Swiss-Prot record:
Gene, per the UniProt record: yrbD
Transmembrane segments: 11-31, 66-88, 92-114, 139-159, 172-192, 205-225, 238-258, 292-312, 350-370, 390-410, 416-436
Name under which the protein is recorded: Putative sodium/proton-dependent alanine carrier protein YrbD
Topological type in the membrane: Multi-pass membrane protein
GO cellular component: plasma membrane
GO molecular function, one term: amino acid:sodium symporter activity
Source organism of this protein record: Bacillus subtilis (strain 168)
């Protein structure tokens, strides 16, 4: 099993694949004229606009659900792993993939809004929907929905719950079995409450956990502020093989930085579009901009917080390709949350293990919530027009079982399975958004045109020549009749 998964990951995450992902993000950046810079202010403004409705959630709730998926163990364990095997230069490549990935997140989330539907009284959308309605290739849409369902329900929850269990056992001595039981009870309470309960939980937990984590990192940075020039220099020199110690790791720095960056911020992965489609907005681009900014929050803020805590304190190990250590400050500590714990303990003795365990719990738990929502959306797609009550119940039980199983299985297998699930989804979604870039670009131009006229943009797909955007055609007709 482990050998097969390793072989699959070697193909899904080979070096040419990574460069292709970078190239696609850069191409979208050029096509949108680097909207991630031009519309930075608008991204922030749109986060707090819009209200929830019976069918949809507010922009902030959609952002919170998306961030609950983006901000997970990758922000703590993933960053540490990238530094361990790619050196400090991997941090730069995580930043790079976030910057250009914001354009990919914009495209996929705008597409999710354009082709969303109102199904069973709720807004639904995502890659499966825009593949079928935008490309007209139903088998491809079904393939993505099936892949997403398998990844989100079976493969990915274990990565998160495993990290929670390991952190809690290390900090408080509580067995993984007990942690697993507690996780299942709490998760069950939330997911059996439906989308609204997930949205409400996310909007309460996510801001609290992200701000608290970033504040602690700022305290550590201030206490080690004299190291700032050296750390920034080390990151940039290591990223481009200009540092003598890390010069031989440039390929690994790019590979680990991009892989862990994508794993963390999910830009182009096809997960963010699901909550994006649920937002109640007057124009698809509004939510596209919000989701682009969520990539910044995840990587430039939260991942950077972890990286800076580790690098400012020097609490990390980095291995060369032959297994020898280039940096070996933490003997006997495996790459992962232990780096962050040691970094915090070096400044605030005795505080590291407990804080990281609590942070991991919140980060990972909300991510599992998001996984459920994504899996539920894809079941809704596959079951359209048919009774899905029992399928939804089965999904809830499966994701609860996968979460429990993850607490007691090995971390290496958990991460390998997670990488495989992510890799499959990335490739199916990337093919789709490359082929469907035009509708998203047309929507962006339309939005910018209306903003220049001083209007609050509304969306008329027919005027732009965008077909099969049935929800928006009805919405525009209804709005026109209301105004007239």
């Amino acid at each position: 099993m482990a050998d097969f998964v390793a072989s699959l990951n070697a193909v899904l995450w080979s070096t040419p694949v990574i460069y292709i992902l970078l190239g696609i993000g850069f191409a979208f950046s050029i096509m949108t004229r680097f909207l991630q810079v031009r519309h930075l202010k608008e991204m922030i403004v749109q986060m707090f606009k819009g209200k929830s409705s019976e069918a949809g959630v507010s922009s902030f709730q959609a952002l919170s659900i998306a961030l609950s998926g983006r901000v997970g163990t990758g922000n703590i364990a993933g960053v540490a792993t990238a530094i361990a095997f790619g050196g400090p230069g991997a941090v730069f490549w995580m930043w790079a993939i976030a910057f250009i990935g914001a354009a990919s997140a914009f495209v996929e989330s705008t597409l999710a809004q354009i082709y969303k539907v109102k199904q069973d009284g709720q807004y639904r959308g995502g890659p499966a929907y825009y593949i079928e309605k935008g490309l007209g290739i139903k088998w491809f849409a079904v393939l993505f929905a099936a892949a997403a369902l398998i990844a989100m329900a079976f493969l990915m929850p274990g990565v998160q719950s495993n990290s929670i269990a390991a952190g809690i056992q290390n900090a408080f001595g509580i067995s993984p079995f007990v942690t697993g039981c507690g996780l299942v009870l709490l998760l069950g309470f939330i997911i059996f409450g439906g989308v609204k309960r997930i949205a409400n939980a996310a909007q309460m937990i996510v801001p609290f956990m992200a701000i608290g984590y970033i504040l602690l990192s700022l305290i550590i940075i201030v206490m080690n502020v004299s190291e700032l020039p050296a750390v920034i220099s080390l990151i940039f020199k290591s990223a481009f093989a200009l540092d003598s110690a890390f010069g031989g790791l440039i390929g690994m720095a790019i590979s680990w930085g991009v892989k862990r960056g994508i794993y963390s911020n999910e830009a182009g992965q096809g997960t963010g579009p699901h909550p994006a489609a649920a937002a109640e907005v007057s124009h698809p681009v509004k939510q596209g901009l919000v989701q682009a900014f969520s990539v910044y929050i995840d990587t430039l803020f939260v991942c950077s917080a972890t990286a800076f805590m580790i690098l400012f304190t020097g609490m990390y190990n980095t291995q060369a390709a032959d297994g020898s250590f280039i940096v070996h400050q933490l003997k006997g500590v495996e790459a992962g949350p232990g780096f962050t714990q040691a970094a915090i303990d070096s400044v605030l003795p005795g505080f590291g293990a407990g804080f990281v365990a609590i942070a991991l719990f919140f980060f990972a738990f909300t991510t599992i919530m998001a996984y459920y929502y994504i899996a539920e959306t894809n079941i809704a797609y596959l079951a359209r027009g048919r009774e899905s009550k029992w399928a939804m119940l089965g999904l809830k039980l499966i994701i609860l079982a996968a979460t429990f199983y993850g607490t007691v299985k090995t971390a290496s297998l958990a991460w390998a399975l997670g990488d495989a699930g992510l890799g499959i989804m990335v490739w199916l979604n990337v093919i789709a958004i490359v082929l469907l870039a035009k509708p998203a670009l047309l929507a962006l131009k339309d939005y910018e045109r209306q903003k220049k006229q001083g209007l609050d943009p509304i969306f008329d797909p027919k005027a732009l020549g965008i077909k099969n955007a049935d929800f928006w055609e009805k919405e525009y007709t209804h709005e026109s009749e209301r105004v007239s």
